Amino acid sequence: MREATRKDGEAIYADQGVREFHRGMGMLAVSNLSRRLLGEAGDSAMQQRQHERMAATPPNWKAASELEGSNMYYWYYGSLALMVGRDAQGGEDRWRKWNIELKKTLLPNQNKSGPRRGSFDPGGDYWAQAGGGRLYSTALCVLMLEIYYRYEPEYLRSHARELAPLWE
């Protein structure tokens, strides 16, 4: 994890260097969540840097076509990371603002009628357009909207404490 995360918080998919499709906000969010679940303290400098970058790039439906920017993959892992990071300095406020933007982004874009009622169009989302389609976009959007019903941060943190010595 350390080798795959730059000092500015940007993360890469593998330690082979930055290549196309292997970096971006989605990877940053995955890095943040993974580091936290592996015991990194929520108030560490890296956690704070990554949280600040995510907070500055909230979910935005119109920007979903950006491969390395604000897409559904990023929104999902960003939602998990910021929810788990609520106990860090400023974390509750970051999560609250993110969650408001997430709902403002997702709910108006859910199909309200017809045979596709309840689903989410792939829209301009890069990964949905690259093959995931309606199933991908609907699954991720539903998982994001129910995130606080499925994950209890204290449970995740209690298991992460066992791994905290790895980061010392």
Question: Model-predicted segments: where are they?
Answer:
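An alpha-helical repeat/solenoid feature that recognizes helix-turn-helix modules
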Residues: 2-104, 112-157, 164-168
